[in-house]
Amino acid sequence: MEGKATELLAVLKNNNLAIDVKVSHLLSIKSDIKQKNVPDNAVHLIFESLRLAITSHHAALYAAGFSTFGHFLKRLFIQDQAHIVSAYARHFCPVLLERLGDHKERVRAQAAQIFTDLWPAASADVEHYVLEVALTGKNPKAKETSLIWLSNMSRNHGLLFRSYVPSVVSCLEDADSFVRHTAKSTVVELFQGAPARAKADLTKEMTAQNVRQSIVNAVYANIGLEDHSSTARPRSRVEPRYTPCTDSHPLRSASRAEVVHQQPAAVVSSAPLRPSKEATPMVEPEPIKSRPGSSKSDKGRTIAAAPEAEKAPHMETARPSSQDGEAPQPLHAETSKQVEDLFRVLSPAFEGRESEDNWRHREKYITSLRRLTYGNAPHDFPQPFFTGIKTNLDGIFKAVNSLRTTLSTNGCLLIQDLAKIGGSRIDPMVEVIMQNLIKLCGGMKKISAQNGNVSVNDVLANVTYTPRLLQHVTSACQDKNAQLRLFAAGWLKTLLNKQSHHKSSLEHGGGLALLEKSLKRGLTDANPGIREAMRGAFWTFHQMWPARGNNILSDLDNKTRHLLEKDPANPNRDQSSYLSSDTLTVPSRSALKEAIAAHKKARLAPAKTLPPRPESAQSSFSETKVSDPPAKSTGRTARAPLSSLSSAPMRPGAKPRRPELARPATADPYSSRKTAATDAVHIDSSPRPRRVANLGQAPSSTKSKPKKLDIPMTMAVDPVAPSASNENETQVATQVASKVRKRSSLSEQFAAIKRDDRDINALSELSINKTEHPHEIAVGESSNNEAGRHDDHAPCEISFDKLDRHDENKLSESPTPGPDHHDENALGELSINVPDRRDETALGELSINKPQRRDENALGELSINKLDRRDENTPSKSPPSEQDRRVEKTIDSAEHTSQAQRRVEESEPYFARFKIRSRLSNKRRNISPHSEHLENAKEMVRVAGQRIRSRSFDLFAYRKLQDLIHYHGEKLFTRPVFDDLLDGLLVELRKEPSPDRKHNGDYADVKTQVVGTLRLLEKSCPNLFVIDYDAIDAIFHARRYFETNSWIVQELQQTALEWFRNCEPSKLEGMLDTLVQYVQRETRDEPGYRSILMALSLLTDLIGDANKKGAWFSNEILEQVGTIAARDILAEDTDIRKKSIELCVQLYVMSTNLYQDKGVSFWRLVKAPEGGTRQLIMYYIARQ
């Protein structure tokens, strides 16, 4: 046989021989195989010969090859040489696979039979090529044959088919009708006698792959599931009743693949069986070709498949959907491998660009991912699920950014579902999600942008907060795209609501500064829609940080603030203006409109019936003479009175006469004007009771004052509880400052409200005082015109910054004669403004024509510790002479103060400008009798340092400590006690402010009291207080916690500057070296830049002072300063760069004066920067 095998191989390789010769040699060796054993040396030759025969293109030759191959395999199994079959199977399977897809059915059947013969010896290779390659391939003939082979092997050889069910089910939706028909027959055969669990798996698989309902119903009917949907359409002609594929098959005769091949029992029992797979892919592989007409029914299949999916016993009910009105049917996974298989199957569909061929598959896979998200995968198999999501995130956003609306919407819904269900588990991918969604929100397509907006809201509301999220939102708030800014207002509110119970996460890392910047820009945006949307976010911010909200509110203009306060989101808005129309009015909106129209008609009707009036009589009546009843005045908006830019009163415009205002025609037409124009000198003798009500209504025509601003209407020294006596004294001083400073817009409003709220009693009280002092009346009359100019400009504030000890010395050295011409002018101003005071006691006791003594402090009684007095609620009992001295000293101090010193920054709160300096200049401290004893005071001070370190020291305790220091001075301390107190103050100054202490006062006030106490110790205890390096470091460290626009920053800068200027020359070099080292080691972040900015400002001032005096610092200090300037001139912060330029200018002047080398040493000090930086420095030096 070896010789025949060798001859056969040579014949088959010879292309010159006829086919009949080759066939005859092949049949000859076939006869020998059937009758004799095959020797081992001939096995290889026969396998190679059969391979050449089967691959031949001649039908006679490959038919003889298939026939010979079958007998050859039987002989090898009989000889117990299955291992040889297994070894050669892997080489023969590719050849057989090609024949499995042949266009001739007979050839396909022969190839299938050879696979059946090979299976007992090489089951793994055979199943791989037939059921994993051919069944999922592109050749419909190979698919059809593979399905028939699977049915045969399952029925006759016990092949476990569970792992191949997804591939079979995918063939139910194949583009080829023969494949679909064969797949239905195969499914029916496989599951006809299957257990209930297997049928449930089949139901789930068909639902997962969206098999059309007609096919599903046909399968259910044939496998014994009687509860299939009755709504399916009738069976068509192309869908006959299905019978097993071995019984009948249309359009072809039975093939050899359907012949039952009986193997010997020993061979079958010894054949290795392949274990079944547990994992079942839930999505079919990408089809080759879409079935015609199936695209329009994709959604219909999903909806129709839902009732069938509900039959599965383990299926959960669907959750409510986020936006599309109906949640997708949950898809449950049995194992983690199923989840991995799903992501492996869908990945190829998202490769490359979107096209007409792949967009439907992308949409289907996105829907499958949504169903999987609503299933058990995120909870039972989170690791493979979220890993797969992260891996395919790029493909998901290809769907999100698609131009097809349905695909983009489904992608956004998937992101929303992931955010809601995944929560913090999608944190690793939230950066990519935010970048893509924000880009989507800025697009021109409204539907996609709105979907992106909702998706961003869901992501922000469910993922873990990070500062990067806030940066994304605030960046969108400042974007050029108006639509993005509009959406960002809602995102900001969502973020604030989510973090409302975790404010510290926003407060750290500069989050509050970003929030304030975004809110300010949004509230003043040019787009009204953005302003309206940002108001809701502002009031959410205001509820979390009231003090910062008030700062933002105070910086807005009147119109913006008015609209902001009237916003429905304002929890503290005044409901009085809405009481009549919203709360007390029960009828509907239409009834309200009718009532308003009727009221207007009633108002205008009498004007038509009025007879003509002579010109000598008044033709209209001023509205100031009458006032409507309170119920009416609160229910309608006050009409804006006619006015001009001048504050002088003018005749109101003509208005129709009302029936209830009829009066004699001989009435004085100028009476109202007299009342309105009456000054502090002229008082109408005829009282008008209704005038009081009208004065109370006057403010309704102006802008309503801000409700949350911590700026009082009177000059209360302590913002917590101003006393009556303080109000009287500070109001007198306020009038003196009316010519000194420029009032702010808020002061105008409060002054107008104060002025209009005065009643006639103040004028009556003034007439009594004038009777007692006739010479005062003359002075008042001489200044009548001036009063007309300044009456409306009475300021609400006065600066005490410059009333320091220098002014006190000037006042104490001045002579004390009677009133002269200078006093008359001051008294004239006071007498003009006296009627604006409401307190009768203050006016009764004020005697300004008896100045006798000027040796006391002008601000002696103006202490911010008035709150500690026991008689704070009673009128002042001081003798008239003492009040005279205070008034005269205030006038003299105000007039002797230079104009530059009188200027006050309007952006600061009203009490911040004199809180510290007024205490330093105040010599008269009222302390309790217990504290007047030195031993008792020492005991109090001894524990002060420890209490400050433990943060149990409130604002009132600081003020009490300052009173003790001022009263007792250095006698209060020993060196250990003083050092302990100083250490406690410096520790508190370095500590980061804690928001939980705000109920005791704003933490800026605490730091302010610490700074004030330090400056008081410096002035009161000069022998104990030493300005050392720790104090400088602490005051610069405190600067890190406050924004540049905070008023405490000025106090910190002024304190540090005074310490350096008052430092001994021997220690100045060391302190400058400490300052420079502090700047070098400070971190270059937002808090660090604040300290650096203050240090650079201080260095600039100190070098500037030295330049004016012609002095200079050592070369080492100048080199360090040059290093700092060169480093920070390119800093990220704009203020730092600006201040570095100023420092370079001063350093250039000092180096030029020191070295006399025309700037050569300066460029050496700043490390000789090149390019634009050098030109910039040279420009500012030249401009200087």
Swiss-Prot record:
Q: Which InterPro entries match?
A: ARM-like (IPR011989), ARM-type_fold (IPR016024), CLASP_N_dom (IPR024395), TOG (IPR034085)
**BP GO terms, sorted:** astral microtubule depolymerization; cell division; mitotic spindle assembly
What are the alphabetically sorted keywords of the record? Cell cycle, Cell division, Cytoplasm, Cytoskeleton, Microtubule, Mitosis, Nucleus, Repeat
Bias class Polar residues marks the residues at: 572-584, 723-737
- Chief subcellular site? cytoplasm
Query: Where does the chain cross the membrane?
Result: none
For the region Disordered, give the residue spans.
229-336, 564-584, 602-906
Looking at the keywords, is Cell cycle present? yes
Q: What does this protein do?
A: Microtubule binding protein that promotes the stabilization of dynamic microtubules. Required for mitotic spindle formation.
Give the record's subunit note.
Interacts with microtubules.
What name goes with this protein? Protein stu1
